[in-house]
Amino acid sequence: TPHDFSLYKLGTLQRRIERRMAMAGIESGAGYLQVLREDSGERELLAKDLLINVTHFFRDTAAFDLLGEKIIPELVQRQTLDRPLRIWVPGCSTGEEAYSISMLFLEQIAAAKRNIKLQVFASDIDADCVAFARNGIYPESIEADVTPTRLARFFTKEDHSYQVVRELRE
C-alpha cells in the first residue's frame, strides 16, 4: 500500500496483524506473509485495520479549549465579510473532530454577531470514514463528550442516536 506504517508502535502493529490473521484463519506469520504477497484485497484490509481511527467529540480538551478561547475568536474577528471562512480538517476519520471544530466556529461567529459564511472541508484516506462522517449519525454515548447545549443546538435526537444538523453536515 502507499501508506507508511514505519513509525507505528511495534505492539500496535503486532496486535493489528494478529487480528487480521485470526480473521483470515491463518496461524503462522509466514503463512500470512504469503497471503499478503498474493492477495491485494488482504493487503488493503490490513492497511485499513492499521489506520488508527481513534476519535470522539472534543477529544483533546486542552487543544479545543485553546481553539475556542484564543485562536477561533481571533480568526472570526479578522475574517472579511466578502468571502467565506474556509477551514480544512485533514484526517477527519468519522467526523467527530471536524464537527467539533465547526461547532466552535459557529458559536464564535454567533457570539461576535458577524455574518460570516463558514466552509469546512474534511478529508481522510479512508472513504468509508468520510461517508460515515457525511451521514453524521452518532451513538447516544456522545452525551459524555458533547454538552447538553451543543446537543440541543447541533444535533437531532433519533431513537438511540444523534444526527448532526444539516447546517453542520453541509
Report the location of each language-model feature:
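A short N-terminal interaction module
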Residues: T1-L85
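Glycosyltransferase donor-binding loop in the core domain
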Residues: R59, S93-T94
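Active-site catalytic pocket residues across diverse enzymes, especially alpha/beta-hydrolases
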Residues: I71, F105-I109, I137
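Active-site lining segments that contact anionic ligands and/or coordinate catalytic metals
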Residues: D82-I87, A98, N115
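Generic beta-strand/beta-sheet core signal
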Residues: W88-S93, I101-S102, S123
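Extended basic-aromatic, gly/pro-enriched interface segments that bind polyanionic ligands
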Residues: P90, A111-E170
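Conserved SAM-binding loop of SAM-dependent methyltransferases across substrates and taxa
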Residues: T94-K113
